[in-house]
A protein has these predicted regions:
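A "functional boundary" signal
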Residues: 1-142
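Alpha-helical structural motif
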Residues: 122, 129, 186, 193-196
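Alpha-helical transmembrane signal-anchor helices
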Residues: 138-194
Length: 196
């Protein structure tokens, strides 16, 4: 049972209480032992992972927060849990860090799954975040498209300049050849005059 001291449910509740009391290190210790037990017994590690992600979020350790959100999201997906929070929390975190493409992919997936299992509360939470990420993602795509067009134009202009430069060089070489021939002809004529 959840309330039996030493049970996984009890330990998870204890860790939540410790997080609330800002005893993060103690909470992490309990959550890590739960994580290990869940792993050894073949249970889903989603719940201890989200707990660890929350603990590291409180401590300001974004890298470990991301790591455990990802582990929790993967565990949820493997367990075919459709009403998960890890993935959209990870999407939000990635969005804040500027990883728009992955944030967009994860939030879309979260929305589809929340809609699929008719999770009204979760859908509402996600739908507040989805338009923001969507808009930013679309703007990023537009920006990339604009940069691509600018790059194509710049490349075209450079090619035209290169062609003009090559034509100019070719024209100058032709003129040089004509001048060289004229000089050679004059030299030959001078030789004839001198030999006479």
């Amino acid at each position: 049972s959840m309330r039996r001291p030493g049970s996984q449910g009890y330990l998870l509740m204890m860790s939540e209480k410790l997080l609330y009391e800002e005893k993060y290190d103690e909470a992490i210790e309990i959550l890590k032992s739960c994580y290990k037990t869940h792993e050894e017994k073949g249970y889903s590690v989603a719940i201890p992972s989200i707990g660890l992600a929350n603990a590291y979020a409180f401590m300001g350790n974004t890298e470990l927060q991301k790591k455990y959100l990802a582990i929790s999201a993967i565990a949820d997906i493997q367990a075919a849990t459709k009403e998960y929070i890890s993935l959209w929390k990870l999407a939000n975190l990635l969005f804040q860090e500027g990883d728009i493409k992955r944030a967009y992919t994860y939030i879309e997936c979260s929305m589809q799954d929340a809609t699929f299992c008719n999770a009204r509360y979760r859908t509402q939470e996600i739908s507040e975040l989805l338009p923001v990420i969507s808009r930013t993602y679309e703007n990023k795509l537009k920006e990339e498209k604009t940069q691509m067009v600018a790059l194509v134009i710049l490349t075209s202009v450079l090619l035209i300049i290169l062609l003009i430069a090559l034509m100019f060089i070719f024209y100058q070489m032709k003129r040089l050849n004509v001048a060289r021939k004229a000089v050679n002809t004059m030299n030959e004529e001078l030789k004839h005059i001198n030999s006479d």
